[in-house]
Amino acid sequence: MRVSRYFLPILKETPREAEIVSHRLMLRSGMIRQQGAGSFSWLPLGKRVLDKVCQIVREEQDRAGAQEILMPTIQSADLWIESGRYNDYGKEMLRIRDRQDRAMLYGPTNEEMVTDIFRAYVKSYKDLPLNLYHIQWKFRDEVRPRFGVMRSREFLMKDAYSFDLDYEGAKAAYNRMFVAYLRTFARMGLKAIPMRADTGPIGGDLSHEFIILASTGESEVFCNKDFLDLPVPPADVDFTNDAEIGGVVSEWTTPYAATDEMHDEAAWAEVPAEKQLAARGIEVGHIFHFGTKYSKPMNAKVTGPDGQEHFVSMGSYGIGPTRLTAAIIEASHDDGGIIWPESVAPFDVALINMKVGDAECDRVCEELYAGMTAAGREVLYDDTDQRAGAKFATADLIGLPWQVIVGPRGIAAGEVEVKNRATGERENLPISAVPGRFGARR
């Protein structure tokens, strides 16, 4: 893609309403535009990142055995009345009526609808376990939306829902999602720490929030530093092996970790002082087992091996890709701008022509653009006539992992300069070696 043809509305000044780093950088880099309180349009650069975040989420959900569906944003109030949540849900839920005066709502979540789908088709334990997920826009009328897409009213969510015959099956499903989440965040360059969360009136111990450490985090967190060195499950982890998956979960839940709401001073005191880490954190995912909370009132049951009917045991598993995009920026930026992990970067390489109009600079840039693209890399070619300093500032701001800088002096020596955005390291490469230096996206 050529910058001269790309819709990239860079802002030179930081908008006054932006309170945190991710909000400032997303606005300045032209990723998003605010349309109203807690409502944003995703512009081309931001949409590319969002799509890549969603793709990683999909790949790991699929790997863990979940199946993607798509449910509508507008739901019938009847389902929520049936579950008992319609009157319990507060003003966060947007309630509407259609032209037939039927009560509808803009879904803030999808437990009722997915349970309705399940009960319509699944009647036997032989069709279990089942895990269905979708990625869809949600709306919650937040009292005070703030921090950009970190706490907005309209947001994108991946919601997965598991259905099992009994608690043991539900726990195995929970563990699979636990491991899938570890892999998901690691692939985005994040170290997410699972922290025990409140299970509310349902009770039990199957509820975890996944927290990344960031100075701008909303929550105060306490954890054992051992988490920082724990290995992430590999791509070939066997999701069909409950013992293997359970072992990973045990390893990741043994060290102490808690948000301030769940913090236990007595247990914290048992952690060696040199291993205690108190910091701020951002929630990027939440998994939760809720048993028969919805299956009972909505009569979602299957015939078990004993010939009796059983209400299915359910769990829900949420990741917000829009929020997650902002969280990645909070965890990976510097004074110059965003530093994207390669897996979610909107483009791999910023190709910078230092002297547009110079025949040799133009020729070399065109050759490199074609060569890197043919090698499988996504290249954003700055072919504009802006001064060099402005081009460098833009490249740093939007945070592409690599910058390839082409100028007359380097061409005379048969070289171009390559800069690593994350480390700042620079090297000179022969022009002919550049396409090979950037193989296909990993």
Curated annotation (Swiss-Prot):
Domain of life, source organism: Bacteria
One example of a Gene Ontology biological process annotation: prolyl-tRNA aminoacylation
Annotated GO CC locations: cytosol
Listed GO MF terms: ATP binding; proline-tRNA ligase activity
Subcellular location: Cytoplasm
Predominant place of localization: cytoplasm
Keywords linked to the UniProt accession: Aminoacyl-tRNA synthetase, ATP-binding, Cytoplasm, Ligase, Nucleotide-binding, Protein biosynthesis
Similarity-based family: Belongs to the class-II aminoacyl-tRNA synthetase family. ProS type 2 subfamily.
NCBIfam families linked: PRK12325.1, proS_fam_II
Known function: Catalyzes the attachment of proline to tRNA(Pro) in a two-step reaction: proline is first activated by ATP to form Pro-AMP and then transferred to the acceptor end of tRNA(Pro).
Complex formation: Homodimer.
Protein name (Swiss-Prot/TrEMBL): Proline--tRNA ligase
Species of origin: Chelativorans sp. (strain BNC1)
Encoding gene (name): proS
